[in-house]
């Protein structure tokens, strides 16, 4: 900006703003500080792989990844952890699947239901990997886990 009476704006990326707020909160809470010193910062999200995952779910993953990266850029030990809630039970057969085949799995955890496509360990594994296999294309760095393990 010119010096003709205009103020120079100091604008931070939203992920950096959130990272700064998290760091400040941790620094001001002795219990949190002690925990984070042992474990690092965890940015956590969870998805139930109940069928085709809506693209809107990706918004959360992009946000969480950006916050974890902002924390790391500030020298913090941080990681984004995405958990598949595959221990959750099937409560509705998706309309695009054969009801006769999958209705018998009502109430069964997604990790224990056969995949609709060969090559996957379970229903939950198939639908979770439909998205997470694309993370590299979007630059998302996540540690993947399963609630069923």
Which residues are covered by each model-predicted region?
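N-terminal Rossmann-like or analogous alpha/beta NTP/dinucleotide-binding catalytic cores
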Residues: 2-149
């Amino acid at each position: 900006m010119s010096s003709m009476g205009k103020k120079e704006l100091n604008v931070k990326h939203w992920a950096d703003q959130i990272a700064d707020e998290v760091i400040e909160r941790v620094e001001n809470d002795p219990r949190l500080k002690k925990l984070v010193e042992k474990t690092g910062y965890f940015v956590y999200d969870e998805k139930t792989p109940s069928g085709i995952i809506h693209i809107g779910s990706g918004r959360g993953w992009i946000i969480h990844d950006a916050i974890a990266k902002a924390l790391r850029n500030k020298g913090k030990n941080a990681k984004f952890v995405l958990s598949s809630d595959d221990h959750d039970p099937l409560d509705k057969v998706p309309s695009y699947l054969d009801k006769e085949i999958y209705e018998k799995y009502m109430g069964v955890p997604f990790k224990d239901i056969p995949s609709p496509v060969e090559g996957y360990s379970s229903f939950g594994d198939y639908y979770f990997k439909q998205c997470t296999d694309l993370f590299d294309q979007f630059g998302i760095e996540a540690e993947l886990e399963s609630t069923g393990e």
